[in-house]
Amino acid sequence: MDNSGKEAEAMALLAEAERKVKNSQSFFSGLFGGSSKIEEACEIYARAANMFKMAKNWSAAGNAFCQAAQLHLQLQSKHDAATCFVDAGNAFKKADPQEAINCLMRAIEIYTDMGRFTIAAKHHISIAEIYETELVDIEKAIAHYEQSADYYKGEESNSSANKCLLKVAGYAALLEQYQKAIDIYEQVGTNAMDSPLLKYSAKDYFFKAALCHFCIDMLNAKLAVQKYEELFPAFSDSRECKLMKKLLEAHEEQNVDSYTESVKEYDSISRLDQWLTTMLLRIKKTIQGDEEDLR
C-alpha cells in the first residue's frame, strides 16, 4: 500500500473513532457502558496514528495520538494518556518541534503527578535535546537539563544526574556563565574521585573547571590548579594539569607562541574537541599579539 493508501485508511479510522466518541455521549450509551466505546475509540485513534506514521504524515500522527491521550484522561487511565502524549511528541519531533515539546510537557505533568520522576527526567532530556538541535535555544535546553538532574538526584540516580549537569556546565561555560560551570565541574569531579570506576575522569572535570577559572582571571586559575592538586594528587601527574601550568606560564610571560606550542603538543596526543578549542581560544585572545588560530 502506498502512502496515499495508508493515509486514506488512517482517515477512515479517524472517522470511525469519532463516531465511537459521539455514540458514547448518547443517552443509552450513558446507561449501558459508554466508557467501553471510549476505550475502543482510544485504540482506533492509536491505530490511525500508526497508519499516519507509516504514511510519514507526522503532524496527523501526532494529532491522532493526542486525541487518544485526551480520551485516556477522560477514562482516568493516566499511564496510557502519558504514553500517548509521548508517542505524539515523538511524531511531532519530525514536523513541529514546539508541538513536540508541548506534548512531552503534558506527559511529564502526568508522570510527576504519579511520582514517576525517573521517566519525567528522561522526557526533560528529550525536550532539552529539541531545544539544542531543532530550536537552538540553549538557555531553555539548560533549564530542562537542570530539571532532569534534579529529578534524577531525588531518585538517587546520581550518574544520570551528573550526565545532565555536565551538559549544563558545558553550555554555561560557552555562555560565559563561568562560575556556574565551575561549581558543577568541581562537584562532579569531587564525587568522581571517590569512585574507583570514575576516578580517572576526575582530572578532566578539574581541567575544565580550571579553564573556566582562567577565562575569569589568571590568578583564579593558578589558585584553582593548586587546590585541585591538593584535593586530588593524581591530577598533578596528568597531562591536563601539565598543560594548565604551561598555559599559565605562557600567559604570565605574554608569550603567544609558547601558548600555541603547548596546545599543539597536547592536541597531538589527545584531540581537542569543539568545547576545549573554544575555551582555549578565549584564553589565548587575552594574550597580547594574539592571532586567531590555536595551531
From Swiss-Prot:
The modification N-acetylmethionine is found at M1. One of its GO terms (cellular component) is neuromuscular junction. The keyword Phosphoprotein applies. It holds the Pfam family SNAP. It comes from the Eukaryota. Its main location: membrane. Keywords: Acetylation, Cell membrane, ER-Golgi transport, Membrane, Phosphoprotein, Protein transport, Transport. It is found in: Cell membrane. SUPFAM superfamilies: TPR-like. It is a peripheral membrane protein. Changing K122A: Does not affect interaction with GNA12. The modification Phosphoserine is found at S26, S29, S195. The keyword Acetylation applies. One of its GO terms (molecular function) is syntaxin binding. One of its GO terms (biological process) is apical protein localization. Interacts with PRKCABP, and disrupts the interaction between GRIA2 and PRKCABP, leading to the internalization of GRIA2. Found in a complex with VAMP8. Component of a SNARE-like complex that contains at least ZW10, USE1L, RINT1, STX18 and NAPA/SNAP-alpha. Interacts with VTI1A. Interacts with STX12. Interacts with GNA12 (via N-terminus); the interaction promotes CDH5 localization to plasma membrane. Required for vesicular transport between the endoplasmic reticulum and the Golgi apparatus. Together with GNA12 promotes CDH5 localization to plasma membrane. Belongs to the SNAP family. This is Alpha-soluble NSF attachment protein. It comes from Homo sapiens. The gene is NAPA.
